[in-house]
């Protein structure tokens, strides 16, 4: 009773495998192991053959599709096109060298499927951090290269100092070789301050006298100490008008108004 049931179960499993194989179906039936399906051993051998053909012909996707690590050759074929496939001293930083996780390679990780599952996320994070650091380093190097042509790209300690140029004998001779008329024109171009001789004498007398400690020092020898006498008050008040006191003007106006009212 049990043999027909067991035989039917095995045939059902074989049918499921053959249905999923698809293109490999003809290869399973053509193999020598699938010729004898009358016994249980022949059916099991046929199932193993179909399973081997299925694993060999099915497309390989990167990742843990069957909860098993891929073989090393397939991993190299899949990941050899990317730069982050390489591990070891070239891509490890100083921080990774301090830790013990910097020297792992794909062969070591592939031998331990459990470590491959748990360390996948850590390796991905470290790879992203390394790529960000490399990008920042490249950006800094490019910036230093592009900014070295400008004055503000250099450090503060290296300031540009003015170059002292000493006149040579040839320049002195060239200045003496100017004609007299050109020298006069050059001298007329300068703006000399207009000062009165009387004011200079007064200022000279004040400077020669002793300066007391209690008084403030007045800078009479500068132009901005005070305007000349003829330019004070905007020039509209002449000395004649300034001699008339303000009170006399008010008195004269009041007297004139009184005479007009009396008349």
Swiss-Prot record:
What name does the UniProt record give this protein?
Answer: Pro-opiomelanocortin
> What is the scientific name of the source organism?
Aquarana catesbeiana (American bullfrog)
Q: Which residues are glycosylated?
A: 91
**Which post-translational modifications are recorded for this protein?**
Specific enzymatic cleavages at paired basic residues yield the different active peptides.
What keyword terms does UniProt attach to this protein? Amidation, Cleavage on pair of basic residues, Endorphin, Glycoprotein, Hormone, Pyrrolidone carboxylic acid, Secreted, Signal
A GO term, aspect molecular function: G protein-coupled receptor binding
Q: Where is the signal peptide?
A: 1-26
The modified positions for Phenylalanine amide read: 87
Source taxonomy: Eukaryota, Metazoa, Chordata, Craniata, Vertebrata
**What is one term from the GO cellular component aspect held by the record?**
extracellular space
Keyword field contains Signal: yes
Q: Which domain of life is it from?
A: Eukaryota
GO-annotated biological processes: neuropeptide signaling pathway; regulation of corticosterone secretion
**PTM annotation (Valine amide): residues:** 156
Q: Propeptide residues, per UniProt?
A: 107-141
């Amino acid at each position: 009773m049990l043999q027909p049931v067991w035989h039917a179960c095995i045939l059902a499993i074989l049918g499921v495998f053959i249905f999923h194989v698809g293109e490999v179906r003809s290869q399973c039936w053509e193999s020598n192991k699938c010729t004898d399906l009358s016994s249980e051993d022949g059916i099991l051998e046929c199932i193993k053959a179909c399973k081997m053909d299925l694993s060999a012909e099915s497309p390989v996707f990167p990742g843990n599709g069957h909860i098993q690590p891929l073989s090393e050759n397939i991993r190299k074929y899949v990941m050899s096109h990317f730069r982050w496939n390489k591990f070891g001293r070239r891509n490890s930083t100083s921080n990774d060298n301090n830790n013990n996780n910097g020297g792992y390679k794909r062969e070591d990780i592939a031998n331990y499927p459990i470590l491959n599952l748990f360390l996948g996320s850590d390796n991905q994070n470290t790879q992203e951090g390394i790529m960000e650091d490399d990008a920042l380093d490249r950006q800094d190097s490019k910036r230093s290269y592009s900014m070295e042509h400008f004055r503000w790209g250099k450090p503060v300690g290296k300031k540009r100092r003015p170059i002292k140029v000493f006149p040579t004998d040839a320049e002195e001779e060239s200045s003496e070789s100017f004609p007299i008329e050109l020298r006069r024109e050059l001298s007329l171009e300068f703006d000399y301050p207009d000062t009165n001789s009387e004011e200079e004498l007064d200022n000279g007398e004040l400077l020669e006298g002793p300066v007391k400690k209690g008084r403030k020092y007045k800078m009479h020898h500068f132009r901005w100490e005070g305007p000349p006498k003829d330019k004070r008050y905007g020039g509209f008040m002449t000395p004649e008008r300034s001699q008339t006191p303000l009170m006399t003007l008010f008195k004269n106006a009041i007297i004139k108004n009184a005479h007009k009212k009396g008349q």
